[in-house]
Amino acid sequence: MLEFKIEELKLEDLKEAIKVIEDTFLKFEAPDYSKEGIENFFKFANYESIREKLNKNMKMYVAKISGKIVGVIGYRDNSHINLLFVLEEYQHNGIAKALYNLVIENCKNVATKKVTVNSSPYAHNVYLKFGFIDDNQMQEVDGIKFYPMHKEL
């Protein structure tokens, strides 16, 4: 099992976190998306957009190994996971689960009753393993494919 450390994202680490998101998205999710979907994903998942959201209602945590960011999770309003990415070479080592568990604990601590996610097709089985339930069939909005899901806490 890999040893990793989870910490709240610091602004000086945002560019590295964005790189993890970009690399993982392009490898595993972009092949299922239209050109429009890829463009719209990057309208959301870019430095300026995420920095602005961090100043409002979004929080992010990163997993680091020897100081290198290998995983990222983001959530907003203490109730909606909007990013969860782990670099390919570090997947299947418990990093996504550890990031997820931290967010769930944070949500429980503020009395959140339900957490939602719009899961990509690639991550759908991961969220099912985490105990999420599909709210609907796969949907596509602005070229972005997702499964709306929720989990009662």
Q: For each predicted feature, which ranges?
A:
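A short, internal acetyl-CoA/4′-phosphopantetheine-binding micro-motif in the GNAT/acyltransferase core
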Residues: 84-91
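Conserved catalytic-core motifs of GNAT/GCN5-like acyltransferases
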Residues: 116-118, 133-148
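Conserved GNAT-fold acetyl-CoA-binding loop/helix
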Residues: 22-49
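Conserved acetyl-CoA-binding loop-helix of GNAT-fold acetyltransferases
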Residues: 92-105
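Conserved GNAT acetyl-CoA-binding A-motif
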Residues: 107-120
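A short helix-loop-beta-strand connector motif used in the catalytic cores of GNAT acetyltransferases and
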Residues: 45-61, 80
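A short beta-loop-alpha structural element at the N-terminal edge
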Residues: 4-19
